[in-house]
Design a protein with these regions (language model features):
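Glycine- and charge-enriched low-complexity intrinsically disordered segments
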Residues: 104-114
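Short, small/polar residue-rich loop motifs at catalytic or cofactor-binding pockets
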Residues: 62, 91-93
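Short, Lys/Arg- and Gly-enriched loop/turn segments at beta-strand edges
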Residues: 84-90
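Conserved protein kinase catalytic core
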Residues: 25, 87, 107
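His/Asp/Glu-enriched, well-ordered alpha-helical/loop segment
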Residues: 1-82, 98-104
Length: 114
């Protein structure tokens, strides 16, 4: 089940999502599950898993402009706490700031604070 490595190797665009309320809505848990797949041969890198849960969703719906940080691109992005790890016992990453269409919609007030 969830043959992430096989799909990735075959060049299949793999976009993660959630089947909530069947399972908990947890994007980072899904990324961690793909990185630490129960079948070692089906594990994918953290970068591939993160892309599957971010930019791949835009690509799956035919949007080839969103999901990148580039001049003129729509400003949809999040800044994450990089001290977090996808190790099963480590705390999950925390969103420090989220920007949608250029407007800040979430801010913990720690980005750029000294």
């Amino acid at each position: 089940m969830n043959r992430f490595a096989d799909l990735t190797a075959a060049g299949v665009l793999t976009a993660f999502g959630s089947d909530s309320p069947v399972t908990d809505l947890g994007p980072w848990q899904a990324v961690a599950a793909a990185v630490h797949h129960h079948q070692p041969a089906q594990r994918i890198s953290p970068i591939a898993a993160f892309r599957a849960h971010s930019v791949a969703g835009w690509r799956a719906v035919g949007d080839h402009e969103s999901g990148v940080l580039a001049p003129g691109a729509p400003a949809h992005y999040a800044i994450w706490d990089t001290a977090a790890s996808l190790n099963g016992s480590a705390p999950l990453p925390t969103a420090l700031r989220t920007v949608v269409s250029g407007a800040t919609v979430h801010d913990l007030g720690v980005v750029g604070a000294r």
